[in-house]
From Swiss-Prot:
SUPFAM superfamilies recorded: EF-G C-terminal domain-like, P-loop containing nucleoside triphosphate hydrolases, Ribosomal protein S5 domain 2-like, Translation proteins
Protein name, per record: Elongation factor 2
Transmembrane segments: none
Localization per Swiss-Prot or TrEMBL: Cytoplasm
Length: 729
């Protein structure tokens, strides 16, 4: 029997014993060595050759991942590991580290119970380290730490034992500071989740040279850091690997310190699902009941050239089998399961069934998207997966040949299904479509894949930055009148407090929640009690309050009012950009008693006009997206690096020394950061490494607003004259 087939059989057997299952993700800042580490784990499990581990990058299966040398998609693999005489099934997801692909990390965290955070010993904790930790902790996923590239401290930087210990302890302290800050507010975590060398939740080593150590492994092998430094310096890395193999150290840590599904699900389910906690479904999810109703949370959609769409996700309850007819949240009817399987590296292996507590690969769920709840009974869906950052860059995309247009439209729909952080706007009339993503690289990869994988030659436009509009002060009460003059609505707008905006963004307050729970969440974020009781609708980060009392026919008209409200908020009055962070109050209404005179053609424009005029009275402004920028550069080039930020309307917040490099930290508008890569390379003679991270939106300077508004209105084919009442720039 082939080695691979044997592993599949072992996995199938272990799937039925949740105590021996560990669902884990490996996450880190870009280039800190996740995929090389994953190769080592695969080699340790006998799934790839030990000789090629670290070079094969077995989890980077796409051509563009191999070319760019970075992980773009999260990849799944199941493997086995024997720990303390017991065989364990480890379902592992290798995630991207580049900020543009953070959506894949967020979705992966929903499927797992533990996150192995990898940090480069030389660079230390970086911006994306903080982001992946936040993504893990928000989903109730327990972290451990592996400090990689320790060989560089010994051989390259020639650090002595004291210097090295100081550096490693500093990395651990930084990571623990992040963990403490994020878990303080989490009531459902009653244990200390900080990492510790003594406890065995920290490992050290070199993924490239395949050796690793932890406190338990040093006690077991009798090796200490002195031995490691001697072997590393005398270039006896193979002996080091043989005496203390990396895979054993890391997988032992995974088995010992990460929870199994039986321990994890009772804590995680209330965090990610807001249904009735007394129901049978709740009970079978919390107890990982393989005989309960089937509940699958889809975290990823991929396409196989032979099998078609494959939905990957975590089975929280029941047992998935071929032929089952399952509900998909947000769609009518049922989908029939064509096959179930598990992942072995880049390939899917079909199995008879996948029980609760495992990660499965399913075909046949044609209506599912990343984030869908799939179940054998109709149920409250899981909380939507909140992505840390929203799209900030848009490009137009069109087929070079008109004959390819239908295929391109279909492909774009598929792209947004596979990656919910990509937003697609399809205009079937003009043939020009818009694709929005997290950054230039994100869009570049998606458009190249459309050309390469689908064979559709495309033209793309210049990158366009996504803006927002927001009120700056409370407005007066404004009247909106319907075209037939029989219906009147009295509206005011005010800025929504930032804490309430954050609560909505994080999913702590939404219209999907029971009303009482939503009220409490909004009050906790700072909303007044009476206001929270009158919340009628939440759209984006805008809240609509109905302050009216006993108005006849209002209930039956409310749906049209909300439609008009959403139209006004989707296209703000300045430049038809989305409005955010506003509280809209309906104070009073006058409605015609005859329904025929208060139909859509009357109510929607009246509401839209009232909201727009209120926003103008509230001195609405354009907001631009900004990015945090960090540049690591030799001292001689520090001035050039800070000049690159300042020359882009940016601001330098901090400069400090870290090792032999200077670190420059600041913020800059996304619009000005287009083309930054090539400019910083030439300014620093290729000596700089840098990171950017989306940091939300800020009000654009008043002197820049008119020109930017004109530019956007021109691009959208709108008339250039703003409403006369906009006279505050």
């Amino acid at each position: 029997m082939g080695r691979r087939k044997k592993i599949v059989q072992e996995c199938e057997t272990l799937m039925n014993t949740p105590e021996q299952i560990r669902n884990i993700a490996i996450a880190a800042h870009v280039d800190h060595g996740k995929t090389t580490l994953t190769d080592n784990l695969l080699a340790g499990a006998g799934m790839i050759s030990d000789d090629t581990a670290g070079e094969q990058l077995a989890m980077d299966t796409e051509e563009d991942e191999q070319e760019r040398g970075i992980t773009i998609d999260a990849a799944n693999v199941s493997m086995t590991h024997e720990y303390e005489d017991t065989n364990h099934l480890i379902n592992l997801i290798d995630t991207p580290g580049h900020v543009d692909f953070g959506g894949d990390v967020t979705r992966a965290m929903r499927a797992v119970d533990g996150a192995l955070v990898v940090v480069d010993a030389v660079e230390g904790a970086m911006p994306q380290t903080e982001t992946v930790l936040r993504q893990a902790l928000r989903e109730g996923v327990k972290p451990t730490l592996f400090i990689n590239k320790v060989d560089r401290l010994i051989s390259e930087l020639q650090e002595g034992p004291e210097e090295m210990q100081k550096r490693l302890m500093s990395v651990i302290a930084d990571v623990n500071e992040l963990i403490r800050g994020m878990t303080e507010e989490m009531d459902d975590i009653d244990e200390d989740w900080t990492v510790s060398v003594e406890e065995g939740t920290v490992g050290f080593g070199s993924a490239l040279y395949k050796w690793g150590v932890s406190m338990p492994s040093m006690q077991r092998t009798g090796m200490d850091f002195g031995d490691i430094m001697d072997l590393e310096r005398s270039d006896k890395r193979q002996e080091l690997h043989e005496r203390t193999p990396l895979a054993d150290v890391v997988l032992d840590m995974v088995c010992e310190h990460f929870p199994n599904p039986i321990d994890a699900q009772p804590r995680r389910i209330p965090r990610i699902w807001r249904g009735d906690d007394e129901s049978e479904v709740a009970e079978s999810m919390q107890f990982v009941d393989e005989d309960g109703e089937v509940v699958l949370m889809v975290t990823d959609i991929g396409v196989d050239p032979h099998a078609g769409e494959i939905a990957a996700g975590r089975v929280f309850s029941g047992t998935l089998e071929k032929g089952q007819e399952l509900y998909v949240s947000g769609t009518a009817g049922k989908n029939r399961v064509q096959s179930v399987g598990i992942y072995m590296g880049g390939e899917r292996e079909e199995v008879e069934e996948v029980p609760a507590g495992n990660i499965a690969a399913v075909t046949g769920l044609k209506d599912a998207i990343a984030g869908s709840t799939v179940s054998s009974v109709e149920m409250t869906p899981f909380e939507s997966i909140d992505h840390i950052s929203e799209p900030v860059i848009t490009k137009s995309i069109e087929a070079k040949n008109m004959d390819d247009l239908p295929k391109l439209i279909e492909t774009l729909r598929q792209v947004s299904k596979e990656d919910p952080t990509i937003q697609i706007e399809i205009n079937e009339d003009t043939g020009e479509h818009l694709i929005s993503g997290q950054g230039e690289l994100h869009l570049e990869v998606q458009t190249q894949r459309i050309e390469r994988n689908q064979g559709i030659p495309v033209n793309t436009g210049e990158p366009i930055v996504v803006y927002r509009e927001a009120p700056q002060q409370p407005s007066r009460e404004v009247e909106g009148i319907s075209p037939n003059r029989h219906n009147r609505f009295y509206i005011s707008v005010e800025p929504l407090e930032q804490d309430i905006v954050d609560a909505i963004k994080l999913g702590d307050a939404s219209m999907d929640m029971p009303e009482l729970e939503r009220r409490e969440a909004l009050q906790e974020a700072g909303m007044e009690k009476e206001t929270s009781q009158n919340v009628e609708h939440i759209h984006g980060t805008n809240v609509f309050i109905d302050d009216t009392k006993g108005i006849q026919h209002l209930n039956e008209t409310m749906e049209l009012l909300i439609e008009g409200l959403e139209e006004a908020l989707n296209d703000g009055p300045l430049a038809a950009e989305p409005v955010q962070g506003s509280l809209i109050r309906l104070h009073d209404a006058r409605l015609h008693e005859d329904a025929i005179h208060r139909g859509p053609a009357q109510v929607i424009p009246a509401m839209r006009e009232a909201v727009h005029n209120s926003l103008i009275d509230a001195e609405i402004r354009l907001l631009e997206p900004i990015q945090n920028v960090r540049i690591d550069v030799p001292n001689a080039h520090m001035g050039a690096a800070s000049g690159e930020i300042q020359g882009r309307r940016g601001r330098v917040d901090d400069m400090y020394q870290e090792g032999d490099l200077m670190v420059v930290e600041g913020v800059a508008p996304v619009d000005e950061m287009i083309g930054f890569s090539s400019d910083i390379r030439s300014a620093t003679e290729g000596r700089a490494s840098w990171n950017t991270e989306n940091a939300g939106f800020q009000v654009m300077a008043d002197n820049l607003q008119p020109d930017k508004i004109d530019e956007i209105r021109t691009r959208k084919g709108m008339k250039l004259e703003l409403p006369e009442t906009i006279d505050y720039f």
